[in-house]
Amino acid sequence: MSFSNRLVIAALFSTVLVSAQNNNNSFTPRWWAKYQTLLQNGAGGAAGPTSSAPAVGANVDVSNECGPQSETFITLNTLNAKSIAGGSNEIFRDPMRGYSSSDGGATWTGVDLPLPPAIGTNGTDFGSDPSLAFDTRGNVFYSYIVVFFGHGNGINGTELAVARSTDGGKTYPSANFFSFSSGSNHFNDKPMIAADTNLNSPFRDNIYLTWDAASGGSTSGGIRFARSTDHGASFSIVRIDNPKGPGRVIAAQPFVGPNGEVYAAWNDIAANTIAFNSSFDGGVTFGTPSVIASKSIAFDIGIPAISFRRALIYPSCDADRSSGPHQGRLYCSWTDLASNGVNTDIFTAFSDNKGSSWSAPQRVADSLSGSVDRFYQWLSVDAVTGEVNISFYDTRNDTTGQRFMTDVYFSRSSDGTSWLSPNSRVTTASSNEHDCNGVFPCSAIDYGNQYGDYEGLVSFNGISHAIWTDSRDQLNFAPGCRTNLAMEEVFTATIR
């Protein structure tokens, strides 16, 4: 759809601000703001240090292009760790954006992901919700959703997409589009992808995908799991949450154990828990869903740093695939209310029996005086060292007195029982997705998306790569861009 068919930016921001402030429907699809754009034109502190302080490298602008980008993901090739691939949403354009680096994250190139033909007269479509995984053959698999709509006629449907790159993420010639669902109350949301990269696994290079098949909160919704044994050419699909449950679930993530075990965790909105299921036959069959932990925030929360989009609650999990003492241990993380009932904090739990039981939730971030929010965590277990790494947004450096400003912080644990303190600051400059030096609303901020729904982290052989939405350059003059301002960018940093 051409820019001339969309609203001018001033009208866009006023529309998004009003709709965000008045929207009390917590189950609006997370890509709704992007759709609207196109349609209209605490507790006890973390324990002491577990290792020396990490060394954080330079902050690198990965996207470096017009318009806002948000909602980031990153992965790497375990057989060539300098080959890294990432992705993000493109807010003012229709396709997804892919990023690749062949030098360990020092420099990056970008590419658009394929979209299918639109449906109907004057129809169009767009992509959202990036997730990526390498297999052991060097293929990159990039999953996302496609949302179809007719101009002025509402949503025509959604479907899943998995694109494959054979050159490290530089190009994605085609994609497999599947699981189409039609109707405004039926949509596929929040796909996450994983690959079995265990060299001795009987399911090596299987591709796994999870998402929530939302259906207006009816029992026909629920968490879907798809498996591919032919490198993404085809997928078989099963439901892995309670098939008799209310179907009010979101943000499932698949992850793989050291012997090819398949795990998935998600936010059970109705039960207000972080839920879990497992498969020991390569994703063919699953057991009965169980609970990792109860929580206080059911779906999302409007904290000052992300008050318009609101911070989604989701699990980020991984398994120890190293040969170390905790091989096979599972780790999960999530955001929830701090003990003061006001701020948000990051929690983790682990399991040594393949998810049959879990440890009591443990805080990750430093205990600080004052009011501090933490949100949008991502957890990655180093498959070589077994160390557990986590990154998250944190408002501890806010100078507005309103918890508007964020930085990305990082922590590390050898076993998930104690976390590196003090946490390490990753960002060299803070972001503010609320105002621009006190000016509110600000045309340099995409209020409908702000930080998106998550950020990313990947760790391997003692090195971690964090990726996030960054607005430090939001007011920089960018001639020829829609707002003539840089707005949100995708940044990354290497942590050793």
Q: Each PLM stretch: what is its role?
A:
Residues A10-A11, W419:
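Preference for short coil/turn "hinge" residues that link or interrupt alpha-helices
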Residues A11-A20:
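Hydrophobic h-region of N-terminal signal peptides that target proteins for export
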Residues Q21-R496:
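C-terminal PAP-associated
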